[in-house]
Each structure stands twice: as structure tokens, then as C-alpha cells.
From Swiss-Prot:
Signal peptide: none annotated. Homodimer. Keywords: Cytoplasm, DNA-binding. Residues 80-106 are annotated as: Disordered. PANTHER family: NUCLEOID-ASSOCIATED PROTEIN YBAB. Belongs to the YbaB/EbfC family. GO terms for cellular component: bacterial nucleoid; cytosol. Binds to DNA and alters its conformation. May be involved in regulation of gene expression, nucleoid organization and DNA protection. The keyword Cytoplasm applies. This is Nucleoid-associated protein XOO1065.
């Protein structure tokens, strides 16, 4: 029984280190979302902070379309970050047996 507890503690420590590393990598990540065939680009960090917005001047005359494309580009970047986060967090916990129903990050 002691061996099992010690093994669980080692697994937990390794998982914590892996998660910390994955979170640090995500914080450095920059992802660009696009909309309108590249007419609007929004770049977000892994923490979903907006770094850059590029808008093709040709769409500025149609305010509603510009607003929709900006929102779509932001959502595209946000979805890419979510997918990358899920992938990296999954890799950080690969091979570790988690109790049923337990999801990460905690």
C-alpha cells in the first residue's frame, strides 16, 4: 500500500511539473485567427489577450460587415487557442491514470 501511495505522489508531482510547463508554453503562444478570406486577422496570446488586429481597408466602408469579420476572426483565434490548450494539457498528463471523471486543468 505504501508503494502505491508513493507512486501516486510521484505521478502527481510529475503531472504538476508537466502542467506548469504546458501553461508556460501556452502563455508564450501567439495564434492568429482569420475571417473574410484573410481580410481580417486577429492575433491573440495563449492567455487570450489581443496583440494585433489587421483589417483590409476595403471593408471599412461597411461597418456591420467589418464588425462581423472582426468578431469571427477573434473567435477563430480563440478556438485555435482552446484546441492547442487541450492538446498540450493532454500531452502533459499522457500516461497518467486519473480517476474517472477527473478533468484537467483542475
Amino acid at each position: 500500500m505504501r508503494g502505491n501511495i508513493a507512486q501516486l505522489m510521484q505521478q502527481a508531482q510529475k503531472m504538476q511539473e508537466n502542467l506548469q510547463r504546458a501553461q508556460e508554453e501556452l502563455a508564450k503562444l501567439e495564434v492568429t485567427g482569420t475571417a473574410g478570406g484573410g481580410m481580417v486577422n486577429v492575433t491573440l496570446t495563449g492567455a487570450k489577450e489581443c496583440r494585433k488586429v489587421r483589417i483590409d481597408p476595403s471593408i471599412l466602408s461597411d461597418q456591420e460587415m467589418a464588425e462581423d469579420l472582426i468578431a469571427a476572426a477573434f473567435n477563430d483565434a480563440s478556438n485555435k487557442i482552446d484546441a492547442e490548450s487541450k492538446d498540450r494539457m493532454g500531452s502533459a498528463t499522457a500516461g497518467m491514470q486519473l480517476p474517472p471523471g477527473m478533468k484537467l486543468p483542475f
